[in-house]
Each structure stands twice: as C-alpha cells, then as structure tokens.
C-alpha cells in the first residue's frame, strides 16, 4: 500500500515538473534580425492614445494620399535588441479578408496579440502591417508600415 501511494506521488511530482519546464505564455523565442523594410509615405500607422497594453492596442491607419489602398488582418510584432529589430518566432493564423483604405481616410484596427505572442514583457517593440496598392488592374505593389511602442 505504501509503495502504491509513493508511486502515485512520484508520478504526480514528475508530471508537475514536466509541465513547469515549458515556456510560459509571457516568454517567446527571439529569432533572426529582421529584414523587413518599412515605408511611412502615403500611409502611416499609429497607436490610438490610451489603448496600448501589454496584450493589445488599437492601431490607426491614416491614408495621406489621393490613392486607394487595401490591407488585411495579418500583422507581426518584432522586438528591438541591441539597437536592431528581431523577429519573434511564433505561429499566427489570420482570416484573409481585404479591407479598403480610401483616399484621405483613417481606419481603426483593434488587435489582441495575447494568443500569439502572450503578454509582452518590458521592452521596445514594433507592429508591422502590409499595405497593398493596385497600380494597374490586377497588379499590386505591397509595402509595410510600422509603429514602434514601449512596454514598461
């Protein structure tokens, strides 16, 4: 009887030990230096004042041109380490609708990255979104916009 209880306790300790060895939801794998080029010409992206937390923000896309653009749900977050931007290795899944950003228009986008990135730790980050411009029917040029932010 004592052996059975001891075996059950030992198994319980092993299971708890194994589950404690993984990464917590607030840690992530920092990848290679980023090679993403960012443009802030016709379209800029900002964070709406008062909306930034360590797990979400409201982005504002502002079209400062007479052109029409499109964007989707995908985004990525990078972290600044030693003065360089680095990718964060996570698997993200997005629905792929296309949204219009008409000439001189602003659009607010609420994002919650907790499921993909977890709660961000103290540091400097940037959110990157791709923007598409149809320069000829069926032909698109894609560029990236980004906004930097700090988590205290």
Which residue stretches match the model-derived regions?
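Positively charged n-region of N-terminal signal peptides that target proteins for export
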Residues: 1-4, 8
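C-terminal motif of bacterial Sec signal peptides marking the signal peptidase cleavage site
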Residues: 17-20
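Primarily secretory-pathway and cell-envelope proteins
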Residues: 22-95, 100-102, 130-152
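Intrinsically disordered, low-complexity Pro/Gly/Ser/Thr-rich segments with frequent PxxP/GP/PP motifs
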Residues: 92-118
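Exposed beta-sheet edge/beta-hairpin loop segments within beta-rich domains
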Residues: 116-122, 136
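A short tyrosine-centered beta-strand micro-motif
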Residues: 120-130
